[in-house]
Amino acid sequence: MTTTPPNAATPGTDDNQLIAERREKLAALRAQAQATGRAAFPNDFKPGDHAVDLHRLHEGKSAEELEALAIPARIAGRMMLKRVMGKACFATLQDGSGRIQLYITSDAVGPEALAAFKHWDLGDILGAEGTLFKTRTGELSLKVGTIRLLTKSLRPLPDKFHGMADQELKYRQREVDLIMDEASRERFRARSKAVSSIRQFMVEHGFLEVETPMLHPIPGGANAKPFVTHHNALDQQMFLRIAPELYLKRLVVGGFERVFEINRNFRNEGVSVRHNPEFTMMEFYAAYWTHHDLMDFTEQILRHAARKAVGTAQLAYGGQAVDLESPFARLSVRDSLIAHAGLSAAEAADTTVLRAKLEAHGEKAPAHWSLAELQFGLFEAAVEEKLWQPTFIVDYPVEVSPLARASDADPTITERFELFITGREFGNGFSELNDPEDQAARFAAQASNKDAGDEEAMYFDTDYIRALEHGLPPTGGCGIGIDRLMMLLTDSPNIRDVILFPALRREG
């Protein structure tokens, strides 16, 4: 009995040699197909069953019941394992739902078909039809009556015992990662469930899903460095969007009182375990909501997504518990310094102390920074990474919140929040600034910063100011990082683990 075909990929084997051998087999298949009038890559096989359903429906039946019922099944998938034993062979077929074992004998399929099967390779895609039975070890299997090669695989799969050890290779050849690793497939299924559940949740709460431009004449909606391109027909510079915010708020001006969009944003910045230049965000806006309403709703969204994707809102990330079930904590920037940075109330209000604390963390605060900016700077340096359980941080300074409404009680801070979990930002929202003159002044300040060399500062968006002049109702808006949420829900340490095809340096 052989369990590994002569041309299966094993450590130390030359892949080029294996590919050459498989190409020879394909050439023979083409010649045979031409001689018989058949297709080398046929597309007329229609599977009627899936592995997971066959197991679910028939796993509990005894061998005797299966023999008496003679249940037919027709399945297609990729051959992952193969055992050749003279006039009989076993193979494991993997389809989109799972795996099932095939039993192929000369008596059932004929000597010619069995001989052909023995030359097929791991990774080939097969179609098989037969009846279900159980082996002597009790494994549900398909006793094959007919079997066909549907797609010849030219590249060998990684060795089943070693898999894809190179993590970057998994990102670069995601299709192979998905073939070999059930955990990877489950991770992306969970992502799909979560995104679908969020979309359904938004619609059920009266939000209209919309699509706004990906190419912007002016980048806006966030402080970030954009990707730049050129529109040939219009002969003008364009930017891949860094955020959809300004377009979505223009829709609220137009009368769509609740809107949301789940789509890609692009930021020409660094790559890390938490950052990918192309990433998925959901932004939503609701007329007559405040930042308090947004926080309540954001909690509900995350809780709902967790339950739908993984069955619970009590999670574990990196071996530590994360509780999305309980109410999320809420702290001002100032109070977070008292709770997590060891400052007293007096110290948190003392600019000299704050500057000294920042220097102790290796940060030199600019001379013009206000009290609120110093508090925020120290928050980023000393507090952010300590916020493991879900925590909303509120009362951000105006200087770092150019689109947020200022607080009526203290105009130096805004009605803005950010949500932190596991020491990372997951969401950002605020009561929207709907005073067109105030917004124009803030855009002007941002434009001055850009002229002074700040590449991430915002442009002055005349179209948006004109829209505001028609009147934006009191509105709340929030953005949630879908990729980081998926990292949390699937306990993934790297953002590239939850993006099917992450950004990588070009090979060669």
UniProtKB/Swiss-Prot annotation:
Binding site for Mg(2+) 1: 418, 425
Name of the protein described by the UniProt record: Lysine--tRNA ligase
Record note on cofactor: Binds 3 Mg(2+) ions per subunit.
One Gene Ontology biological process: lysyl-tRNA aminoacylation
CDD domains tied to this protein: LysRS_core, LysRS_N
Required cofactor(s): Mg(2+)
EC nos: 6.1.1.6
Complex and partners: Homodimer.
Keywords: Aminoacyl-tRNA synthetase, ATP-binding, Cytoplasm, Ligase, Magnesium, Metal-binding, Nucleotide-binding, Protein biosynthesis
MF (Gene Ontology): ATP binding; lysine-tRNA ligase activity; magnesium ion binding; tRNA binding
Amino-acid positions noted as binding Mg(2+) 2 in the UniProt annotation, renumbered to this chain: 425
Location of this chain's protein in the cell: Cytoplasm
Reactions it catalyzes: tRNA(Lys) + L-lysine + ATP = L-lysyl-tRNA(Lys) + AMP + diphosphate
UniProt record similarity statement: Belongs to the class-II aminoacyl-tRNA synthetase family.
PROSITE patterns: AA_TRNA_LIGASE_II
UniProt-listed SUPFAM superfamilies: Class II aaRS and biotin synthetases, Nucleic acid-binding proteins
Lineage: Bacteria, Pseudomonadati, Pseudomonadota, Betaproteobacteria, Burkholderiales
GO CC, any one term: cytosol
Chain ranges passing through the membrane: none
